[in-house]
Amino acid sequence: MSLQKTPPTRVFVELVPWADRSRENNLASGRETLPGLRHPLSSTQAQTATREVQVSGTSEVSAGPDRAQVVVRVSSTKEAAAEAKKSVCRRLDYITQSLQQQGVQAENITVTKDFRRVENAYHMEAEVCITFTEFGKMQNICNFLVEKLDSSVVISPPQFYHTPGSVENLRRQACLVAVENAWRKAQEVCNLVGQTLGKPLLIKEEETKEWEGQIDDHQSSRLSSSLTVQQKIKSATIHAASKVFITFEVKGKEKRKKHL
């Protein structure tokens, strides 16, 4: 007796990610089950389904201060008002002329004067506030004034700071570098699995952080008078960090057309 042939059957299986598979199977403890089977997507659904890769990117950038301010104080106390004024103005003119000869622009020099009576004498004091963008030039000018002027002229330690525009540029740079790092990561992932990276579908900056210097406030206030110029520049350096999350479209490898 001949055996009756079984009619051919077709089985459609879709590989399901482990997370989906575990949800569908509801695995019981101590018992193994077969991977879940799902109905295949229709050709229309397969074409419209968007494949994507989600990556995060981080960055940390820093920038030193772009401005420094130095204050030069000149004072004189005399019994005669004219003598006090003459003493201060003579040294004040010498300071401003020296600054201009060294290439300091007039808009970066601010002069204030104060004249008052002190008991039976007259006291005059003048301040020259100088803003520098070149720190090497600042040090040369300060050294020159210390050498040429007497002890009645007091030169304050430089105060370093950032202009608002430079801080905003640093924030943008941190975000852009984080986006670039995320794009490179997604590009390498797609190359590894034989796919082509598509356009970004979502770009989100999740976290930003800024901090200044590497010396804590207590230590900085205690040592501010003894810090060197380079240490002050380092403590005034601003750091910015950014973290972004990006979703990219994933395309299949494009097949090269064979030309007949």
Curated annotation (Swiss-Prot):
The protein's name in its UniProt record: Interleukin-1 receptor-associated kinase 1-binding protein 1
Q: Does the keyword Transcription apply?
A: yes
Task: Describe the PTM.
Answer: Phosphorylation at Ser-56 and/or Ser-62 is required for full activity. Phosphorylated on at least one of Ser-235, Thr-237, Ser-242 and Thr-247 upon TNF-alpha activation, which favors nuclear translocation.
Localization in the cell: Cytoplasm; Nucleus
Pfam annotation, one family: SIMPL
The protein's matches in InterPro entries, at most eight in alphabetical order, are given as: IRAK1BP1 (IPR030312), SIMPL/DUF541 (IPR007497)
Reading the lineage from the top rank, the first entry is Eukaryota
| Domain remark from Swiss-Prot or TrEMBL | The disordered region interacts with HSPA1 and HSPA8.
Q: How does it assemble?
A: Interacts with IRAK1 and RELA. Interacts with HSPA8 and HSPA1.
Phosphoserine PTM positions: S56, S62, S235, S242
Q: What is the lineage of its organism?
A: Eukaryota, Metazoa, Chordata, Craniata, Vertebrata
Q: Which GO terms describe its biological process?
A: immune response; positive regulation of canonical NF-kappaB signal transduction
* GO CC terms, sorted: cytoplasm; nucleus
**Keyword Cell cycle among UniProt keywords:** no
**Gene encoding this chain?**
IRAK1BP1
Q: What does this protein do?
A: Component of the IRAK1-dependent TNFRSF1A signaling pathway that leads to NF-kappa-B activation and is required for cell survival. Acts by enhancing RELA transcriptional activity.
Biased composition range(s): Polar residues? 41-50
Sites of Phosphothreonine modification? T237, T247
What is stated as this protein's family in its record?
Belongs to the IRAK1BP1 family.
Molecular function as annotated in GO: signaling adaptor activity
